[in-house]
Structure formats: structure tokens, C-alpha cells
Amino acid sequence: MESQPVTVITGARKGIGRFLANHYVEQGHTVIGCSRGDIDWSLENYEHVQLDVAEEDSVRELFRRIRSLGRLDHLINNAGIALLNHSMLTPGNSVSRILDTNVLGGFLFCREAARLMQRRRFGRIVNFTSAAVPLKLEGEAAYAASKAAVVSLTEVLARELGSLGITVNAIAPGLVSTDLIRGLSEEKLEQVLARHAIPRLATLEEVAGVIDFLIAPESGIVTGQAIYLGGP
């Protein structure tokens, strides 16, 4: 009997990542999640690892552990940090931190995941971009730049990995009620929502629904796409 699918989720301690961890455990997956901080919850068939996604040695060690499971089906690159600040007031170390987590971390996880996925000629990678890219939101220069890089990374990897049976897509979840947007004022939140075709918060279930589609075996022809929830 074939073993259950193995899914890796970065940034799984809270918010979207935690919801997705529970969602895929309920679907019968073995889920490995990671974050910089520890968790105060537990799930059956879930393992949590503390690491910085931008630390290459730590990422390699994680995937050595995953290799022992005999398979890797899905990578959901949810880990990310945001910054709302005018470019002239943004220190360089803040920019470096954003790029390390959002771009370098995503790249390292994609690379290591692909090395395992190619063995079975099957894999699904879902990266997280942001509506800040097409909306060109003021005050989010560094964040938008990092998420634009995620789109480019997704498109190039889709071409590099397609012949190996691995698809690579991106999702921009829009505004979801998580810690990432709780610092926004009501006025700023309404301004951003007004620029979407569907001007409301996305639900966690809606985010999971799109990812369900992208990682399904039947979606093997879908790759190199960025899907923006809310339609900016």
C-alpha cells in the first residue's frame, strides 16, 4: 500500500501556515512544518522544526530528515515577512531581512524539495507572492520587490522543473485576517481592499481551496502561474 503524501509547509507556527498544516493533516497527509519560533499546539501526523528558512545548512538538514520518509509530494512556501514603511525611512538591514526570508528562503526550499521530488517524477510547489506587486502599494517597496522576485522565481523554476514532473505555481492570498495585516489601520485596510475586484478579506478556506487545486494530481499541466485572490 502506498504511503500517505508528505507535505512541507514553511511559516507554519501561526496564521495561514497553521491553518494549512491542520487542513492537510485532516486530508491524510504527513505534514512537516517549520518556523523560527516554537509552537504551542500539536497535531497527529505533524512534525514541527524550528529553523530560519534563509539558513542553508539548517534547510539541508531538514530535507535530509524528510528524505528518510521516502517521498516528498508538496512544498508550500508560506513563510514571509512584510514591512510597511516609506522607502526613505527603511533601513538596509530591514530590506536584507525581507529578502532573506521571502526570496532566499523560498529559493532554498524549492531547490531542496525539487531534489527529492525528482526521484518520483512528481511534485507540487506553491510559493506565496502578494497583491502588493500588481497594486504597487506605497510604503511596501522592499516587500513588493521581494514578492515580485518570488513570481520570477516561480516562472523560471516552472521551466526548469517541468520535465521532472514538478509544477511550480504562486498564490497571492490577498488580505486575510492574520498577524500580517493587524498592524494596518482601518482606513489603510479599506483603501487596499478598494483596489481589488472583490473588495473583501479572503478566508483561510478560500486560500486552502486554491492550493488544493494547484497541488492536485489532476493539475499536472498547470505551472508557472501566479493566482491573485481578490483580483487586483
What is each stretch, according to the model?
Residues 110, 146, 154:
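Active-site helix of classical SDR
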Residues 115, 159-163, 220:
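Alpha-helical segment proximal to the catalytic Tyr-Lys
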Residues 86-87, 94-99, 181, 192:
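Substrate-binding pocket helix/loop in short-chain dehydrogenase/reductase
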Residues 130:
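Residue(s) in the substrate-gating loop at a strand-loop-helix junction
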Residues 107, 122, 200-229:
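C-terminal substrate-recognition "lid" of short-chain dehydrogenase/reductases
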Residues 88, 135-141, 163-164, 199, ...:
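Active-site loop immediately N-terminal to the catalytic Tyr-X3-Lys motif
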